[in-house]
Amino acid sequence: MNESRRFLVSGTVQGVFFRSSAKRHAEQLGLSGYARNLVDGRVEVLAHGPTDALDELAKWLEEGPPNAQVTGVEVSAVGEQPPEGFRVL
């Protein structure tokens, strides 16, 4: 079953290639969506795809790329479905 989730990732997540790494990981999982920086220092990831792939992405987001220091991930289900592909905004 496909669904969409929004992840808000806190910590040292900007300036450490978090968005591009999230894009690469999401694409490997076959997810569509986007990753973007927020003005408050967090990264927002909206992803759509199979539940098991979203669960895998959620696990990865808790760690992020090597230079990131993730302190929290807020997850919410959303009704919107992003366009095909995964983008860095």
From Swiss-Prot:
Ranges for domain Acylphosphatase-like: 4-89
Database matches in Gene3D superfamilies: 3.30.70.100
Catalytic activity: an acyl phosphate + H2O = a carboxylate + phosphate + H(+)
UniProt keyword terms in alphabetical order: Hydrolase
GO molecular function: acylphosphatase activity
Record flagged with keyword Transcription: no
Active site: R19, N37
Domain of life of the organism encoding this protein: Bacteria
Family stated for the protein in its record: Belongs to the acylphosphatase family.
Protein name (Swiss-Prot/TrEMBL): Acylphosphatase
Species in which this protein is naturally found: Alkalilimnicola ehrlichii (strain ATCC BAA-1101 / DSM 17681 / MLHE-1)
